[in-house]
Structure formats: C-alpha cells, structure tokens
C-alpha cells in the first residue's frame, strides 16, 4: 500500500533521489542551490509551495508531487497548478501517480480552488494515459519566455 505524507526535513534524501530522477526524465539540470531552495520552500509551512512524498510498504520513496495556487482572472476562486509529478520507474502503473493527483485534487477542493491543472510533454505517453483518465486535455498550447536568456532590452 502506498502512503502519502507532506514533505518534512526528514524526507530530504528520499525526495532528492526522486527529484534527480524527475530532472533526468525530463533531461534537464538545476543547480544545487535551486534544488535546495525548492526543498526549503516545500518544507516551509509559511511558503505557498506544497509537496507530498509517496512511500511504498518498505518506506522507500516512490513518488512526489508539488503544487501551488494562484488567483485567476477567469474565476472567483484560485487555481491549483500541479507543477511537478514524478513516480519512480519501478512503481509506474501501480496507482502511485493517480494517488498523488487525487491527493492534490482533494487538497485543492478543500482549499477553495476552482481548478487543478498541469502540463506534460506531448511524448510522455505513459503519463498521458493516466492524465486522460483523470482530467481533460484542453488542447491549449504552452508558450514561455525565458527571462534569463531573453531579458527585456537584450539583443
């Protein structure tokens, strides 16, 4: 049985292993400073970024989810952005991902949010099988401007 619990400082090593797996899956890197800042935010009750770790029967970390809320111009209630979701490859297909999404959905509903949403890569077919069962593909495209490389006034 999978157990979900809010992240605490005691979860650092297990979270870090999952976080690295998540970054590797998406073929990206973050600095150690950013990684530690992220964990500090996730474990600070005063911060508005939330996180949960999933553990298997042996207490091993098998998944993580991070989320935050923000106001919306389209809704009286806030929206909940599920920013990071990762399940260790050995636990995929076992219901861990669905349990993590359901945890966020229940939390968001109890917190007065009007919507939970997230992004994924088009080619992430295994995850999209789950997402298509629990949510609606809105067919919107995602665009972004990286201000570190495209700062205003930069040539």
Q: For each predicted feature, which ranges?
A:
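Glycine-rich acyl-CoA binding loop
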Residues: 54, 93-98
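Conserved GNAT-fold acetyl-CoA-binding loop/helix
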Residues: 16-41
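Conserved acyl-CoA
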Residues: 88, 99-115
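Conserved active-site alpha-helix within GNAT-family acetyltransferase domains
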Residues: 98, 110, 122-141
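Conserved beta-strand in the GNAT
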Residues: 53, 60-69
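A short beta-loop-alpha structural element at the N-terminal edge
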Residues: 3-17
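A short helix-loop-beta-strand connector motif used in the catalytic cores of GNAT acetyltransferases and
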Residues: 41-53, 81
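A short, internal acetyl-CoA/4′-phosphopantetheine-binding micro-motif in the GNAT/acyltransferase core
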Residues: 68, 85-92
